[in-house]
């Protein structure tokens, strides 16, 4: 039977931020069985607003987006939803911005095209690691 199961624990919430609508759609379709997708942002400003409204457990953020890119999104999301774990997404294998994003608070980095199961695992691990860092 498909649908809501009141006995099952709630799925973790996920915010997706990528300027490419095809990527946003594919990520949503790929991850909707393991996560409750609470928003799909096209730029840093929209990602911050959606994070403030939904307080997601984890945010998957593209490095290169309009409105300040992933760096602005991570700083802004950290300000409005400090418990949200951030995972950086990039098409480039060696993106020079990734180091800055990790320093800014990203929990992990993945490349676009990562296998769906591996991506879900990275997102879950980021959520598990976030409370330990927040408590430290």
Q: Whereabouts are the PLM-identified features?
A:
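Acidic catalytic/metal-coordinating carboxylates
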Residues: 43-46, 67-72
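Non-catalytic signal-transmission and effector/linker regions of two-component phosphorelay proteins
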Residues: 1-13, 120-136
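Acidic, metal-coordinating helix/loop segments flanking the phosphotransfer/catalytic sites
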Residues: 40-58
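The short loop immediately C-terminal to the conserved phospho-acceptor aspartate in CheY-like receiver
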Residues: 57, 63-64
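Short amphipathic alpha-helix used as the core "switch/output" element in two-component signaling
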Residues: 49, 71-83
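Two-component/phosphorelay signaling modules centered on CheY-like receiver
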Residues: 7, 21-39
